[in-house]
Amino acid sequence: VIPIEKLRLTKVIYSHAHCPDGLASAMILKDAFRMLGMEPRIEFLTHGTKEHAQAGISGDGVTLFCDIAPTPDVAQLTRATGTIIVLDHHKGAEALVRSFGDLSVFADEKLDPGVSGATLAWREVWEPVNRETGTHDFLMGAVPINVKEFAYCVGARDTWQTKDPRFQRGQWISKMLMSKPAAHWLGGTRRVELENGAVHDVPERAVLPYLHESEVEMGRALFEAHEEAVRQAVEQVVAYALIGAGVDVYLYVFQEQASGFRLCSDVAEALRQQTDGRTNAAVVAGFAYVVHEPGDSPQLVYSLRGLNGFDVAAFAKANGGGGHTAAAGFEVDPHRELIGRTPYDDIRSRLAAFLKGLNP
């Protein structure tokens, strides 16, 4: 359990950028710290950027990372200072997260299926803070249930628990979250006077469910439109068969959307259904050119999904990225690493080299 007294020293919260789970984590944490009468600065990080490389170095109070971990260099500099809290569930970050000892919680995807950044934010911060302060119980007894359900719906979707009854609702919530800028969900307060006369400024969405039912329904409509984009992406998939570790491994490559809601998970699910009964391991790779900051050169980002047990986290890690067994990714600088070849050629070559390493 992260000590409440350590949470009270938190100055900055870092969460995963361009990700509904990262946004939901930030919403839950903002709410939790408001219960403590605090408002730490919230920033969103993208893996591999200069902002990520510098996050956590400042030494101003405690820094909380959720749904993303500090870089190994920052971890080495700060591990002994007791100024970093890390909550994460990405497989490739396990050793780094656990190295922070009692100020870290790692959710193992096999032991804790469905536990994501949002779930960790609720379980390790929101729920203990609410128990300590009683603020939400006092305001509205049903709210803690709503927060937990919100977190677990997002978690089911983020970790792709397709058999979880909350998965579909998590799809709708995630789609709605990503349809608006983070400031929409994190801004806005409401002054509430309690029965004992105390006055609290709380986030507008802390008093009611984080998403109103009408917003979830909007997310459902957006998701249904999104499914048409998935259908079109599946039609554009280029398939390859590679030999690795003594078996055929299929590679399915398509061009991702550069912004907005990513298609890779849903394309992978559609391909899984199309190839139902096929036992060969497979990798689904969506690629997009992404500009992280205005003025930066575009980077080539690969989103990976594994089918039939293929460990895409290991493949991503071999290329400087990370993630989960079934969902991972990495990025490359196309100006240095893609000279003379297309993303289709590049990802095929990288997977072939990875498979050769498994079965030299």
Task: Tell me the role of every PLM-derived stretch.
Residues 155-241:
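Hydrophobic, aromatic-enriched interface-forming segments
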